[in-house]
């Protein structure tokens, strides 16, 4: 994780400042320790051997001078102490040396306890500095951990947003490919099954649908229903045309058969009239010879007639067998035609059902697509508005932070001015004090008060650290709960996506099955057309055979008359059968129309149910989106709270740094105060030396005067 430049500069400056403080504290402690050790050594050597103290002290001063060049006040103190000890050793008489240890002990009692008391104070200050540095490090570590966690949360949010953005175009591409494939299949089906007029009517709405994707779903549904109705009308018109053509052919055949029957009837009447005329032209009475001759002729003529009758009966039998075969072939052809008609009818029904289900699936897909587009647009708008709100809130927070910083800086300036005034007052009070002992006692009291303040500050800092730890634990708990909730939500979304994918796969399988059924129906239609072609050929052959039979019937009157009567009966039966078939077809068509109407009503009801289901699904999706938006707002609020807490912790860290700086300034002031006290001590020691010199002079004058006093009475005497 990359740190910001401002944080890096602050950390570098704090580290440098801590190093400089450590070095200065170590130097001052080392100097004071060396000074105290040297003073102790000089006191012990004076007690043991005053004659050798001068040389040892000169050597020690030579070594200490190189070690303590930087502290001028300490060197001056050392020099004054050594001068005082040397003068006392040189000038004090032997009888005064017995009493002298008491006085220096008093001086030492007045001066040395302050130095001994300074050592624990300095040690406590160094410990306090180390404690503050450890606390600052702990605060820095906590801040860095919080920053890392916040950055991890931000990165996770960005990753999730990128995944959502990448999933949306993939889903839209899949839907577009599915719709394009379904549209192409529908166009190809319409091109193969319908006329050019229906093709144009089908192409126009698709082209308009491709060009005008932004229109509502109602207009597209109306156009599709119109196309379906036109297609059904065309199919029924084609069926009616076929039936009418068949009826016309049958009527023509009936007219031809009626004409042949009338011709045969006229011929029979003519022959009967001829037979009656021949019978009437015969003579009544004849002779025996003539009667015998006529009888012979009649027998011969009867034999001829019998032969012709037998021949005609044979031909009639042959023709009847041929007619039976022709009738059987016609019956088979009719059966084939009926089976083909039923197959075509079944295929048409299957295609109609397949087309209807296909249109229904396409309508559902388009409705889902429109709903998804609306949802995506609404979500994008909500995201844009939320981003704008976040930007505005960030700007407001930045302005408030800048204002708070300015207020804090102004407060710090006022506090620094007050501190400067108080320090000036303290310096005035300390200057007014004359006695070094009282001044040192005040210093001790001041140090004790500082220690109390330090302990209070430490307690406050520990309390604040405990607070920060508690807040950190709460933040971690909230973060864990948020992670668990986010994982649950993601799992629910993944399950919903898998359900939708399964539904899409099922719809695709259903469409493929319907396409396979349509292909099978096409194959069956081709087979039926082939069978119809064969039936037409057979009908043509039968017609040729009928023509040949009619030519043979024209030569034979009686047989044709009988056959004509039989044919009339058969034709009447056929006409009755055709009428019954026509009635049946009309009833079947009426039933088909009624069934189709009922089917359409059922489809309308199913469409209404599907629309209600889609509305329910849309309401559910909207409620889920609202819930997700609420959760998003809740998470945004949490993030803002965490950012505010982070800012507060940063401000606390800055305040700790400022407190640290104030403590450093206090330490500097204490150093300055110690230097001032050392200078005052130097001045006091100088005054003490002057007083000792004056005392010595006075003692010498008193001794001289005492020496002069005994001589004065002798001279008087």
From Swiss-Prot:
N-terminal signal peptide: none
Organism field: Mus musculus (Mouse)
Coiled-coil blocks: 129-168, 221-278, 352-590, 622-712
Tissue spec: Expressed in liver, kidney, spleen, brain, heart and muscle. Expressed in photoreceptor cells of the retina.
Described function: Plays a role in the establishment of cell polarity and epithelial lumen formation. Also plays an essential role in ciliogenesis and subsequent Hedgehog signaling pathway that requires the presence of intact primary cilia for pathway activation. Mechanistically, interacts with and mediates RABEP2 centrosomal localization which is critical for ciliogenesis.
Subunit structure: Homodimer. Interacts with OFD1; the interaction is direct. Interacts with FAM161A. Interacts with RABEP2, ERC1 and CEP131.
Residue segments, region Disordered: 84-115
Spans annotated as Sufficient for homodimerization: 216-717
Protein name per the record: Serologically defined colon cancer antigen 8 homolog
Sites of Phosphoserine modification: 4, 28
């Amino acid at each position: 994780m990359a740190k910001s430049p401002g944080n890096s500069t602050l950390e570098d400056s704090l580290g440098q400042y801590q190093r400089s403080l450590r070095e200065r504290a170590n130097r001052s402690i080392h100097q004071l320790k060396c000074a105290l050790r040297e003073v102790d050594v000089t006191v012990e050597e004076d007690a043991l051997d005053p004659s050798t103290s001068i040389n040892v002290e000169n050597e020690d001063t030579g070594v200490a001078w190189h070690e303590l060049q930087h502290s001028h006040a300490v060197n001056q103190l050392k020099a004054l102490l050594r001068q005082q000890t040397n003068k006392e050793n040189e000038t004090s008489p032997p009888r005064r040396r017995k009493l002298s240890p008491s006085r220096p002990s008093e001086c030492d009692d007045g001066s040395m306890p302050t130095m001994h008391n300074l050592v624990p104070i300095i040690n406590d200050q160094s410990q306090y500095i180390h404690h503050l540095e450890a606390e600052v490090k702990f605060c820095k570590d906590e801040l860095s951990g919080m920053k890392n966690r916040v950055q991890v949360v931000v990165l996770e949010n960005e990753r999730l947003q990128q995944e959502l953005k990448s999933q949306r175009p993939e889903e839209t591409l899949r839907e577009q490919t599915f719709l394009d494939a379904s549209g192409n299949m529908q166009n190809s089906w319409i091109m193969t099954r319908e006329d050019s007029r229906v093709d144009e009517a089908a192409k126009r709405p698709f082209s308009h649908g491709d060009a005008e994707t932004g229109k509502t779903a109602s207009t597209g549904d109306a156009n599709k229903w119109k196309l379906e109705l036109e297609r059904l009308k065309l199919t029924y018109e084609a069926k009616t045309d076929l039936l009418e053509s068949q009826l016309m052919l049958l009527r023509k055949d009936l007219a031809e058969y009626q004409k042949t029957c009338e011709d045969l009837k006229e011929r029979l009447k003519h022959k009967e009239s001829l037979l009656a005329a021949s019978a009437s032209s015969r003579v009544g009475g004849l002779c025996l010879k003539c009667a015998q001759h006529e009888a012979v002729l009649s027998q011969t003529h009867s034999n001829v007639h019998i032969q012709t009758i037998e021949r005609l009966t044979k031909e009639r039998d042959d023709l009847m067998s041929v007619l039976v075969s022709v009738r059987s072939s016609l019956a088979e052809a009719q059966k084939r035609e009926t089976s083909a008609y039923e197959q075509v009818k079944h295929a048409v029904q299957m295609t109609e059902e397949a087309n209807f289900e296909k249109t229904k699936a396409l309508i559902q897909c388009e409705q889902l697509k429109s709903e998804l587009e609306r949802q995506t647009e609404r979500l994008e708008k909500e995201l844009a508005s939320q981003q704008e709100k976040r930007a505005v809130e960030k700007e407001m927070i930045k302005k408030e932070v800048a204002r708070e910083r300015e207020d804090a800086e102004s407060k710090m300036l006022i506090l620094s001015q007050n501190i400067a005034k108080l320090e000036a007052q303290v310096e005035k009070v300390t200057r007014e004090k004359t006695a070094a002992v009282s001044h040192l006692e005040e210093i001790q009291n001041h140090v004790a008060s500082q220690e109390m303040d330090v302990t209070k500050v430490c307690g406050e800092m520990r309390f604040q650290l405990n607070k920060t730890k508690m807040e950190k634990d709460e933040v971690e708990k909230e973060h864990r709960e948020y992670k668990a909730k986010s994982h649950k939500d993601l799992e629910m979304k993944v399950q919903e996506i898998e359900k939708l994918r399964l539904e899409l796969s099922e719809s695709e399988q259903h469409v493929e099955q319907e396409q396979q059924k349509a292909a099978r129906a096409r194959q069956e239609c081709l087979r039926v057309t082939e069978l119809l072609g064969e039936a037409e050929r057979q009908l043509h052959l039968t017609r040729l055979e009928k023509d040949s039979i009619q030519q043979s019937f024209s030569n034979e009157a009686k047989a044709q008359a009988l056959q004509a009567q039989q044919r009339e009966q058969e034709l009447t039966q056929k006409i009755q059968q055709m009428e019954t078939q026509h009635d049946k077809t009309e009833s079947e068509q009426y039933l088909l129309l009624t069934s189709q109407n009922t089917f359409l009503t059922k489809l309308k009801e199913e469409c209404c149910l599907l629309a209600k289901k889609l509305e329910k699904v849309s309401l559910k999706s909207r409620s889920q989106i609202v819930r997700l938006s609420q959760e998003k707002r809740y998470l945004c609020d949490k993030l803002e709270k965490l950012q505010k807490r982070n800012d507060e912790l940063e401000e606390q860290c800055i305040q700790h740094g400022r407190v640290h700086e104030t403590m450093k300034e206090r330490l500097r002031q204490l150093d300055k105060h110690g230097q001032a006290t050392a200078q005052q001590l130097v001045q006091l020691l100088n005054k003490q030396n002057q007083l000792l010199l004056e005392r010595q002079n006075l003692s010498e004058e008193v001794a001289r005067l005492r020496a002069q006093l005994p001589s004065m009475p002798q001279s008087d005497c």
